[in-house]
Amino acid sequence: MRAGQRVQESIMNVHASALAEAHLPDEQTTAFAREAIEDLSQQPKKLSPKYFYDATGSELFEAITRLPEYYPTRTELAILKERGSEIAKIIPENAALVEFGAGATTKVRLLLNQSRFAAYVPVDISGDFLQAQANGLKRDFPSLGIYPVAADFTTPFELPKAVASMPKVGFFPGSTIGNFEPHEAQAFLRSARQILGKGAQMIIGADLEKEERLLHAAYNDAAGVTARFNLNVLVRINRELGGNFDLSAFTHGAIYNHDRHRIEMHLISRKNQTVRLLGTSFSFRPGESIHTENSYKYSLDRFAALAQGAGWRVRESWTDSAKMFSVHALEAAE
């Protein structure tokens, strides 16, 4: 065993001991703590973007989607409205619509109004937010079977038995696929294909490459909503895990990495500081950052290759006239 491996194992053993002594309330909180400690122990430091999303984080993200600088949501909505009848034609009747990472219901309502779905399965890590959205849909679609699943959609989960015999159509709108590293995106698409089963289809959004000034504005909005969203992961660590991050000592920053075709979001330390979390100390230099999220931007060809590598075929692709955003209909390659 190499010396570096021994040091890493020693560090992880210390962290495991700290977690055992913390008496955290449930498995989800323990998983959050484990990932946070491991990720902050790396160089460069990072935190998983999935932990942006408690009820506050979900509300902040929905606020981001309404910002004038943030083009993806309104552009995708326009595509779904304009191409809704074409999308409906390729969806089997009486199918179950499974939305991975369900948020606000604006987009899914467009699909539900255009197509004759028998059931809707929203899947999201934020259970309270999920249930509230499901209740609103139930009032407007009383004949639709709605079966919320509180789960991390990036890991395997079981669909409700009520939809077992129905054709399955996955729905993954927004630019969330871009938040994964390319190999993680393929792993997610393979997992989704397995969860949805034989004959699966999927409607998925992907942000497209464009001028850097548009990207910079979208992720560094003038109102500072994206900054509050980014900082929410530290708010959660303080509240749920007993951390002592000084929020005023970190600033939000988003940059475009040309070589890797992605926006990178960071929380940047303003000063020399030390933060404690469950018995572990983390030191920061001025300008040192925590890398919190990536948002990869695709060409149509690169996205098609990504999907093909995960066992899907692109049946149809749609874009807006300015080619800012894309929506793809995928079908499982048998």
Which residues make up each language-model segment?
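Conserved SAM-binding loop of SAM-dependent methyltransferases across substrates and taxa
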Residues: 104-116
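Class I SAM-dependent methyltransferase Rossmann-like catalytic core
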Residues: 45-54, 59-91
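Conserved beta-strand signature within the Rossmann-like core of class I S-adenosyl-L-methionine
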Residues: 195-209
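A short glycine-rich, Lys/Arg-flanked "PGG" loop and its adjoining helix->strand segment in the class I
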Residues: 186-198
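Conserved SAM/SAH-binding beta-strand->alpha-helix loop
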Residues: 126-127
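Substrate-binding/catalytic lobe of Class I Rossmann-like enzymes that use SAM or dcSAM, i.e.
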Residues: 214-296, 300, 304-310
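N-terminal auxiliary segments of SAM/dcSAM-dependent transferases
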Residues: 7, 11-51, 58
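Conserved class I S-adenosyl-L-methionine
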Residues: 94-103
